[in-house]
């Protein structure tokens, strides 16, 4: 009788564990593309820890197999997607969010190699049943999310006559409706809109060299614009036909323009580092943009700023900075975490520094207030893959290794 009861308890424990994993897979959060659903770095998660334990939040799982590179994560329907270099090929890889186990891995292009680190830089974009990914050497692919089956692939540099940039193509593709948009950097085809179903060309525009930034849409009246940050300028194009509506070269540093522009209403903040700065432009009813201000107090390098309330929060060089969006007035600056990248969730910034330190920082223009920190246990440095908060977990990547931390408030 005692043995039967033990067997029943073991069976129940296995059943509960299985149900918990299945439930998590169904509610494991939604982060479908670079910087989240709206490309703004803001997670809709609530019920998260307001203060971390001394050694940081508990580790839910850790897995290897992400490969080399700095690709961040896209998360949907219980799957986490990223890209990585394995051997001489770049792969799009799917992991189970509940366990960290690999579901599939699909090769989609050749290896990008560089003295600042090999492998892909961009993040996959989930749209419906498919994933769109752009590798470090310009390989663009459409892959079925459930199975990993390759729908189509092309090299945008070869297709449109562009040449790779110094530290590799770093863009995360933008999907709007039927259009798949990328900064291909070719003559007469700097920006291309492709049919997401088969990769066929819808329109092409401009001749700028590619930048490292990822695009973002902005709605002005009845017109949807797409804002790109190329090698030489920020610019707004009409989504319908690629017509140039405005340009803003002052924000560009002509070295590495990497930050994604920040949008609120008809205003767009565009920023770069290498001693340059950032500017706010306002788009009028005619679709043209005028500068509101330019400042050297917010110089985004790899990491984009996040707009929360009336203030931008971002790394200006290596200094975490809070600045009023409409005026450029600085609220505070702090060096405590060090240079890195950020994501926002439930009242706090999750800051990942290049040296592997992770900080929880309360969002307030009143001043810097840290609520906990820890260091990822193994780091290859620099940790450039941007953090993600989804489904009550903080996801971090250090090259081949992915960490999932439970940040839910118990």
Regions found by a protein language model. Name each.
Residues 24-410:
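Noncatalytic, solvent-exposed loop/strand surfaces
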Residues 1-6:
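N-terminal secretory signal peptides that target proteins for export/translocation
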